[in-house]
């Protein structure tokens, strides 16, 4: 799965490791302003230890983690009979943005999913995240005919 940056012309793409947590938290903090140590610890634990199929990837340049994709594979959720990969985190160090890191990660993920015979990859994006929406659109993602519903628990009653 690992790609050699000298032969592939880009970052080395590899599976994420538990030791990547601090770097993920630091990259996310620089972007979001939030420190989500517990969130990333849980996410990595589920991705690395609890998942039947491990699809989360990291991108390295010169031995430093500069980007990551976190996701999972679901079987039969929400009435879908076929397996579906879910991409829930795309993270690239700001200093390495717009250098093809996210694209390289996504290309490797798609290659891996095809090898697993998983035919669809889904993600959700906030409507105001225009840069991320643009990236996904350029990568071939399109809206699906599904309606996501939400209820504020405090308003229920």
Predicted regions span which residues?
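Loop/helix-junction capping segments adjacent to catalytic residues or to phosphate/diphosphate-binding pockets
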Residues: 34, 99, 130
């Amino acid at each position: 799965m690992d790609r050699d940056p000298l032969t592939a012309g880009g970052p080395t793409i590899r599976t994420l490791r538990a030791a990547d947590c601090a770097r993920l938290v630091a990259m996310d903090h620089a972007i979001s302003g939030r420190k989500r140590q517990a969130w990333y610890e849980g996410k990595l634990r589920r991705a690395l230890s609890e998942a039947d199929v491990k699809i989360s990837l990291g991108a390295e340049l010169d031995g430093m983690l500069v980007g990551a994709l976190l996701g999972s594979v679901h079987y039969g959720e929400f009435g879908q009979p076929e397996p579906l990969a879910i991409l829930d985190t795309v993270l690239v160090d700001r200093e390495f943005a717009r250098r093809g890191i996210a694209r390289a990660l996504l290309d490797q993920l798609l290659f891996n999913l095809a090898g697993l015979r998983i035919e669809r990859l889904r993600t959700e994006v906030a409507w105001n995240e225009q840069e991320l929406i643009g990236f996904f659109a350029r990568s071939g993602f399109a809206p699906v005919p599904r309606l996501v519903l939400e209820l504020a628990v405090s308003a229920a009653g």
